[in-house]
Design a protein with these regions (language model features):
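N-proximal, solvent-exposed amphipathic alpha-helical segments enriched in charged/polar residues
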Residues: 8-9, 13-43
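Inter-motif core of Ras-like GTPase G domains
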Residues: 218-239
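Extreme N-terminal, non-catalytic leader segments
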Residues: 38-104
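Walker A/P-loop phosphate-binding motif and the immediately C-terminal alpha-helix
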Residues: 98-135, 248, 252
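C-terminal lobe/tail of nucleotide-utilizing enzymes
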Residues: 15-17, 39, 58-64, 68-71, ...
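Phosphate-binding loop that captures ATP/GTP phosphates
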Residues: 122-183, 189-190, 196
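Switch II (G3) loop of P-loop NTPases
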Residues: 172-186, 193-220
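Glycine-rich phosphate-binding loops of nucleotide-dependent enzymes
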Residues: 169, 210, 329
């Protein structure tokens, strides 16, 4: 936010400008701390023979307060402006927010489960995290995160809901969960825009759970919002790795850094005898990462508790135990690559 000293540009203020500032100083700052002039929200006030102009800095204010504050300012200015044209613009310092795309070449590899648990693990580590369910045609984050509540809106912006310390939005919260979405590419891309451009406040990192494959939604995200990095999830089997390679190729073509590969469903321990089997193979993702020159972030075993936790709406990372520690370590590895 601009400081009070910098906010009042120009050393010589006319009496009319002083009157304008006095009128604006009667408006209480929405933060509850002083008025909008002393808080430095009034920038470059100027009164000429034909116009009254100023900028209003709304940095740090909830979007729901912007329109009411603008109305108050316009009303105050009208008393000074007379027949002059009023020129008022709102401005804000946008919080730098890093997008981490979580993708896969094909469905069924546990990408959404991994995305949700990474988001929760990062939130538990003290990060301010947002989670966007960009899997428009098959949104599963409301179930995994246990949050089907429909989000409110302020003006044209959605207001994310919070679950397990993570702000989240999903198209699954906005439509009937039992109805198919027969949307063409432009409609899906527009839906993604509504989710990404929501009022995320001071969110530092946004985890975006992408649809499987390399379609319109992926292209929209990569072209318009340029993720800081991408994480690709795959099972060890060759079929998944072939498709994962296509996702990696897309990220590279769009100049999005690959933070690393995660091997999911890596080994199954029999709950009765403890013997470990590898229904999807073993070590394939780590080998592929080495071959492609990509960092291997780690592996997650095929464990019934991870599946049941997601079905129950409480991601494993929100609990304590060995599996939660795995996601905590994965989150640390991703942050190390990102930084």
């Amino acid at each position: 936010m601009a400081s009070p000293g910098k906010a009042l540009i120009g050393s010589q203020m006319s009496e009319n400008t002083d009157s304008l500032l006095a009128a604006l100083a009667a408006i209480t700052d929405p933060s509850g701390d002083g008025d909008i002039v002393t808080r430095g929200r009034v920038i470059a006030p100027r009164l000429t023979g034909e116009t009254v102009s100023l900028m209003l800095d709304v940095t740090g204010l909830p979007s729901a307060t912007h329109e009411p504050l603008e109305r108050q300012v316009r009303l105050a200015v009208a008393g000074i402006a007379g027949d002059r044209e009023v020129q008022l613009a709102l401005t804000a310092d946008r919080t730098p927010r890093k997008i981490i795309a979580v993708g896969s070449g094909k469905g069924g590899v546990g990408k959404s489960t991994v995305a949700a648990n990474l988001a929760v693990a990062l939130a538990r580590a003290g990060r301010k995290i947002g989670l966007v369910d960009a899997d428009i045609y098959g949104p599963s984050q409301p179930t995994i995160m246990g949050m089907h509540e429909k989000p409110d809106a302020a003006g044209r912006q959605l207001l994310p809901v919070t679950a397990h310390g993570v702000r989240m939005l999903s198209i699954g919260q906005l439509v009937d969960r039992n109805k198919a979405l027969a949307w063409r590419g432009p409609m899906a891309s527009n839906a993604l825009s509504q989710l990404i451009e929501a009022d995320w406040g001071d969110t530092e990192y946004m985890i975006v759970d992408l649809p499987p494959g390399t379609g319109d939604v992926q292209l929209s995200l990569l072209q318009r919002w340029k993720p800081a990095g991408a994480v690709v999830v795959s099972t060890p089997q060759d079929l998944s790795l072939v498709d994962a390679a296509r996702a990696i190729d897309l990220f590279r073509k769009m100049d999005v850094p690959i933070l690393g590969l995660i091997e999911n469903m890596a080994g199954y321990a029999c709950p009765h005898c403890g013997e470990v089997s590898d229904p999807f193979g073993t070590g394939g993702v780590e080998a592929a990462a080495a071959q492609m020159g990509i960092h291997f972030l780690g592996r997650i075993p095929l464990v019934a508790s991870i599946r049941s936790a997601g079905d129950a709406g409480t991601p494993t990372a929100a609990t304590d135990g060995a599996e939660a520690a795995l996601f905590e370590q994965l989150a640390q590895n991703i942050m190390a690559q990102l930084n």
